[in-house]
Amino acid sequence: MFVARSIAADHKDLIHDVSYDFHGRRMATCSSDQSVKVWDKSDNGEWNCTASWKTHSGSVWRVTWAHPEFGQVLASCSFDRTAAVWEEIVGESNDKQRGLSHWIKRTTLVDSRTSVTDVKFAPKHMGLMLTTCSADGVVRIYEAPDVMNLSQWSLQHEISCKLSCSCISWNPSSSRAHSPMIAVGSDDSNTAYSGKVQIYEYVENTRKYAKVETLMTVTDPVHDIAFAPNLGRSFHVLAIATKDVRIFKLIPMRKESSSSGPTKLEVQLQAQFDGHNSQVWRVSWNITSTLLASSGDDGCVRLWKANYMDNWKCTGILRGDGSPVNGAAGQAGTPGAAGTPGGPASQNALQAVAGRKKAQLMPG
């Protein structure tokens, strides 16, 4: 059962992204009004805006939290061609704001010559690393060598993807059997260029990222991409938001002992859903990777789950105002797909409906 609650976000323009922190007790929103807002959940379940500030000189496309072991740290990216890192600090005893927290900019990353379209922190086992992608087709990976000094970031890798980039996702697996892997989606509207999703893997011998796979069947613009939590699986699961929702299974092939190159992947399409009957803008997994949420231009959030027969189907539809759509269950995905059956989502799911200035909150 999902209960929706509207939040008067008070943004002056479209909300482009909403992001929970690790514990689900804080969230951040960003907007074309060039601002980021931070929200804290009170004990009675209400969300209160505890910080709001102008972050960029253009639309802010994405905002994301670092793992809390690195402190209260946010990153944002913008049409103004920059990404920024923000840290919350608490006033010192001799400070006029003693005991009060406020957010300060630690650094601005200015390497991109075009709009920075996505920003993501790497999985925490890799250290404090930040990845950006931009409309000129370049993915950049930065590292903070000293986690106590977030004003210093060094550019570690640049990956040229040829196509304009719209979204990135790190494979969260911390297994030593899996090298660091990142998926990149493109919103290039030219369907003559097939393969709008590219997978890159870190190669230890060369100390560089190499392309291991291009998903050639994805020919339409990709708006979002999300690796599922790994949970010890030997394979990877990747969800893609394009003109529909797709779930791919990426199976690493056994390496030859003499091979020093990137891992070869066997790609299987697990499921494909056109239930939105429109462009899909966001996909998000629950923490156990048993439930996938998607939001689209139909103004609905749809929930997808694999049953005990490993077939994916729609288990719920919520309108932009949070009200359920009758007859939601039973919309199956094609083809039949392997997945991990499990209980309902154990995390909150939050979607910002495109074109709205309110965030819709749907705890479950």
Curated annotation (Swiss-Prot):
Location in the cell: Chromosome, Centromere, Kinetochore; Nucleus, Nuclear pore complex; Lysosome membrane
Record-linked InterPro entries: G-protein_beta_WD-40_rep, Sec13/Seh1_fam, WD40/YVTN_repeat-like_dom_sf, WD40_repeat_dom_sf, WD40_rpt
Biological process (GO), any one: mRNA transport
Keyword Nucleus among record annotations: yes
Start-end of Low complexity biased regions: 327-338
This protein's UniProt keywords: Cell cycle, Cell division, Centromere, Chromosome, Chromosome partition, Kinetochore, Lysosome, Membrane, Mitosis, mRNA transport, Nuclear pore complex, Nucleus, Protein transport, Repeat, Translocation, Transport, WD repeat
Cited Pfam families: WD40
Record carries keyword tRNA processing: no
Sequence ranges of the WD repeats: 10-49, 55-96, 111-152, 160-210, 217-258, 275-314
Activity: how regulated: The GATOR2 complex is negatively regulated by the upstream amino acid sensors CASTOR1 and SESN2, which sequester the GATOR2 complex in absence of amino acids. In the presence of abundant amino acids, GATOR2 is released from CASTOR1 and SESN2 and activated.
Residues covered by region (Disordered): 326-364
Gene Ontology terms for molecular function: structural molecule activity
Top-rank taxon: Eukaryota
Sequence similarity: Belongs to the WD repeat SEC13 family.
Subunit structure: Component of the Nup107-160 subcomplex of the nuclear pore complex (NPC). The Nup107-160 subcomplex includes NUP160, NUP133, NUP107, NUP98, NUP85, NUP43, NUP37, SEH1 and SEC13. Component of the GATOR2 subcomplex, composed of MIOS, SEC13, SEH1L, WDR24 and WDR59. The GATOR2 complex interacts with CASTOR1 and CASTOR2; the interaction is negatively regulated by arginine. The GATOR2 complex interacts with SESN1, SESN2 and SESN3; the interaction is negatively regulated by amino acids.
Record protein name field: Nucleoporin SEH1
Protein source organism: Osmerus mordax
